[in-house]
C-alpha cells in the first residue's frame, strides 16, 4: 500500500482574545435584570474567576440577544464579563437616526461588506442593527424582580396606566413579559403620539433610548430624531398596528399611512444580489428592472423579497448558457463576455466555475435563505460619524457562545487567533489559498512558504508536509474525543497565552489536557502590541519586528517572557523563546505574537510545520488506500440531507458508498455513505455557509460532512471506522461498543449525574470525578433533560450532596430548568472541566457548612457543672434560683435542661452571667452565675452538687455522626459523663 505524509492536525487552546471591548456605560438588555450598563452587569456578577492589576473576570449566568450562524437572533448564554484596563484610543461610532457605541479600535462591526474594525469604519458604511431584541417571558423571573403579587389582568392595567403617565422603571420594559410591556406601549403612544404622513411620531424625551429598544421586542424598528421616535416603513407600521395600534381617529390615519408607504428599510447588498443572480444562471439583462439593485439603487425589504423570489425560480435559458460555455453554441457570446465569463474566446476562472455549478445544478433555495434571514432579522443603518478620542480607564466585554452580542442596539463581535491565520489567505491567494473543511481550516504549505519567505531557511531542510489542518472546534473537543489508536485527535497544539495577563483558568485546563494526552505543543505569547511603546508593523515576522523596538520595549518583553518561563517551570516544563531553543524535544518554544496585527504569525506557522515534520513524521505517515478512521465533531440536521455528521478523518481514505460504523447512544450504528460533502472555496460566487461540494473521496487529514441513513443517534466524539467487509464491520462494532461502554454509565448507586457534549469530554469529566472519588450514578452525552433532573432528585432524597447534575459544554432544556428550580435540584454547567468540578466541590463545602450551622443551632451540646459549696454563692434560692457554678467539662448555654446524678430533671438555665455581662455560652474552666428556672436551692439542688446537661438520643447521634469535628476533648468527656448517668435508665447510652 502507498504511504504518504498527511498534514498534521493542529488544535488551538488557551486564552480567549478579549482585546475588543466597550466603554463602561454602553448598555445591554439582560432579560432577568433589564437595560443595564456593562459596568452594572459586571458589578452584579459576584464570583471572581481571575483578578490582577490589568483585568478582572467574573462568572456570569445570564442570557442576552445574539445573532447565530443562520443570521437569526436569539438568546445565548453570556458566561463571563470582563473588566480590562485600557489606555489609548477609543472609537465612537454614531449611526444615523439610531444609537451610537464607543469601543476599542479593533472591535468589529458587521457591515454590508463583511466585518469591519471600528477604526476602519467611515461615514456612509452600513452597520447591522437587530430588528428583534429578546426580553424575559418567564412570569417567575418577572415576579422575582417586582416582588409584588398581582393577577395578570391587574398587571396589564398597571402597565397601561404607567404608559399613560409616562413613568416606569425602564428595566421592566425588558424584564416584564411582552403581554404587559405592550400595554405600557399602548398607554404611552395613546397619550403622546400622532400619525403624520407615513409615520407614527411620539415624543419620548428621556425614554427615547429604552423605548426604541423595547419596540424591537415586537419587531418594530424606529428612527431617533432628537427626543422623538419615528415609526416608519411598511413592515414597522404593520407590526405597530398588530401589536399596539390606536382606538380613536388615529386608527384610520395609521391604516392610510400603511396604504401610502411604499416600502421598508433598504438593503444595499449589491454584491450578494450579483452573486445570487449568477449562481442561478441569470445575466444582468434577464434581471430586467431588478438589475438596478446590483450597483446603483438599494432595494427596500419588499423589493429584496421580490428579487429573491425571482432569482430562486432560476433562468429558463440556463441550458443554452451551458452549451455556450461548453463551446457548442456561438450565440450570445457578447452577453457572457460582459459578465466576465468569457475573455478572448476562452473561459475565465469565473466562467469555468459557473459552468461546473450550472451543470451539476448546485444551487437551490438554501442559497437565498441566508439573505432572507438577514433581511428578516437585521437592518443596515448608515454610519453618521466616527470620532476618535483618548481614554484611560476600564473597558468591558462579554464572553458569549456566538462571539457576538447587542450593545446599545448595535451588533458587536469578537474574533480569535484562527481568524487571523485565515486572513493570510488575502495576502497569499495566488499561492494556493486557505481552504475551509468541515470543522477545520486547511493552510496549504505554499501559503506557509509565501507568508514566511526567508524564515523557512531556519529549518535547513525542505518542508515536505502538504499543509496544516487547524481544527475549528473549541480546544477541548480536539483532545477529549475517542480515538481508537490512543491519544488525542490533534497531533500538535498551539497554546495561546496573553503575555500581559499570564496564566488564566483555561491556560491551566489546557496544560492539563496536553499533559494527559501527551500532545506536543508550542506557545503563542499573544498581545505583544500592548507592550508600552511597541512599534506595530502589520503581518511582519517577529524577528524583523523586534529590531524596530526601543530598548525599553524589548526589556519589558523579556521581563514578561521570563515570568511566563517561570510559570511553565512550575508546571514541569523547560521553556524559552523559540529562537533560543537548543533542543525542541526538551524545551517548550514560545513565539511572541500579536494576533490582532499579525506580528509573529509567520514564525508560528513555520515552527508548527517544522516541528511536525521533524518529530511527527512517522506518526503522520498514512496508508493512502487504507480504510478511513476519524472522529465525529458534530451531529447536525441539514435541509435536504437529513441528519449528517461532521468528521475529521485522520487516517486512510473515505469513499462515497463506503460502509461505516459510528458510535451511537447505546449501540454501534452501521450505515452506508450516501454523500461526502466539503465546503466550496471561499469565493464571491458560492457561499460556504450553505453550499457544499459533493466529492467521491477524501484522504486524511481532512474535515468532511457525511450524509447517510440512521445518523440521528450518532454521538459527537465517537469514532468513525470504514469497514469494507462484513468481518471488518463486526470488528469495528466491537471496538466502538467497548469504547462507549467504557464511558457511558448507568447504575442504581448514589452518585452525581454527568452530561457532556461529546463522548470524549464525557470520558474526561468522568475520569476527573473518579480520581476525586466522587461517585457517578449516570454519565451520558447530550443536554440536561427533565429525566436527568428527576434522577438527580431521587439521589438527593438519599444523599443531598450527590443529588446534582454536572454538565460540560451542554445546555439545560427548558423543561429541565423549570423542574430543577421547582424541586431545588442544583445544576452545574461550564466549559472548563476542573472549574466545573471546583464549583461543585465548593458548593458541597458550602452546603455542608450550612447544614452544620443548622445542626449547631438546633443541637444541645454536653456540659457538666458544679455548684460552689459555699452558701455565699447562692444569690437567690428560687424563682429563679441563681447560683455560682464552675463548668467542669463541656459547655452550657441558656435554654438547656439540667439533670442530677440520678437522672432527675431539676430545671432550665435561663441566663448565664459573668460579672456584669450576660453570656450566650460558658465553657470548661469558666466560673459564672446561672439562673435556673424551676429549681429551689436546698430542695432540688444543693451547694457543691454536680449537675449535667440533659441530652436526647438525637442530640448524641447528631454530635457523634455529623458534628464530631466540632467537638473538643472536653465535650467528649462531658458526653461520656452524661451517658454514664443516662445509661442507668436507657441502654442506648451504654454504647457511647
Curated annotation (Swiss-Prot):
Keyword Calcium: no
CDD domains to which the protein is assigned, alphabetical: aeIF5B_II, Hint, IF2_aeIF5B_IV, IF2_eIF5B
Domain of life per record: Archaea
One Pfam assignment: Intein_splicing
Binding-site residues, GTP: 472-476, 526-529
Transmembrane segments: none
Listed GO MF terms: endonuclease activity; GTP binding; GTPase activity; translation initiation factor activity
Post-translational note: This protein undergoes a protein self splicing that involves a post-translational excision of the intervening region (intein) followed by peptide ligation.
SUPFAM superfamilies in the cross-refs: Hedgehog/intein (Hint) domain, Initiation factor IF2/eIF5b, domain 3, P-loop containing nucleoside triphosphate hydrolases, Translation proteins
Keyword terms: Autocatalytic cleavage, Endonuclease, GTP-binding, Hydrolase, Initiation factor, Intron homing, Nuclease, Nucleotide-binding, Protein biosynthesis, Protein splicing
Keyword Ribonucleoprotein: no
Location of the tr-type G domain: 399-616
One BP annotation, GO: intron homing
Domain DOD-type homing endonuclease: 96-220
Family membership noted in the UniProt record: Belongs to the TRAFAC class translation factor GTPase superfamily. Classic translation factor GTPase family. IF-2 subfamily.
Known role: Function in general translation initiation by promoting the binding of the formylmethionine-tRNA to ribosomes. Seems to function along with eIF-2.
Note: The intein interrupts the GTP-binding site.
Protein name: Probable translation initiation factor IF-2
Organism: Pyrococcus abyssi (strain GE5 / Orsay)
